[in-house]
């Protein structure tokens, strides 16, 4: 494991997902789960998210579609927040989720809309 990539990944993960979230995830890591956190920091964030070929905004847009299709509600809520942090508007998120509904099915779209709306309500009310 490259310490440089790990540090770069952790810094980018904090920017995109928010420092509080990442701090909680890292603090909760134990002997069993720490390798998964380190893999995410180094490979996902240090190698892939930091590549020059796509902007963070574009990567967030892609993630919304893929995570919706995979039916990963916790990760979708997290990445709706990340998408907003990376400059996507609620309108762009809505359009992405409409695209999900057409290509992944109405149930996937409905669930994704419900989860995104929960994030928006949390942000609007200061609950998140």
For the regions a protein language model found, what residue spans apply to each?
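Acidic, glycine/proline-rich low-complexity segments that act as flexible tails and inter-domain linkers
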Residues: 1-57, 85, 111-128
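Residues at alpha-helix boundaries and the short loops/turns that link adjacent helices
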Residues: 16-19, 73, 87, 103
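Gly/Ser/Thr-rich beta-alpha loop segments that engage phosphate groups in nucleotides
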Residues: 20, 67, 107
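Short alpha-helical scaffolding segments that buttress acidic/His motifs in well-ordered protein cores
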Residues: 40-44, 61-68, 96-101
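Short, conserved micro-motifs enriched in small and acidic residues
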Residues: 56, 60, 106-107
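Mid-chain, well-packed structural core segment of small domains
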Residues: 61-64, 68-94
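Short basic/hydrophobic patches in alpha-helices and adjacent helix-turn junctions
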Residues: 82-86, 99-102, 118
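C-terminal structural segments of small proteins and small subunits
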Residues: 102-112
């Amino acid at each position: 494991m490259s310490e440089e990539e790990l540090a770069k990944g952790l810094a980018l993960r904090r920017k995109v997902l928010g420092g509080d979230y990442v701090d909680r995830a890292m603090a909760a890591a134990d002997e069993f789960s720490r390798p998964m956190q380190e893999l995410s920091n180094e490979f996902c964030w240090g190698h892939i998210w930091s590549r020059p070929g796509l902007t963070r905004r574009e990567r967030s847009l892609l993630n919304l579609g893929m995570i919706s299709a995979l039916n990963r509600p916790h990760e979708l809520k997290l990445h709706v927040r990340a998408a907003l942090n990376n400059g996507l508007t609620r309108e762009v998120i809505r359009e992405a989720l409409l695209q999900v509904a057409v290509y992944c099915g109405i149930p996937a779209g409905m669930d994704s809309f419900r989860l995104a709306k929960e994030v928006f309500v949390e942000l609007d009310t200061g609950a998140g």
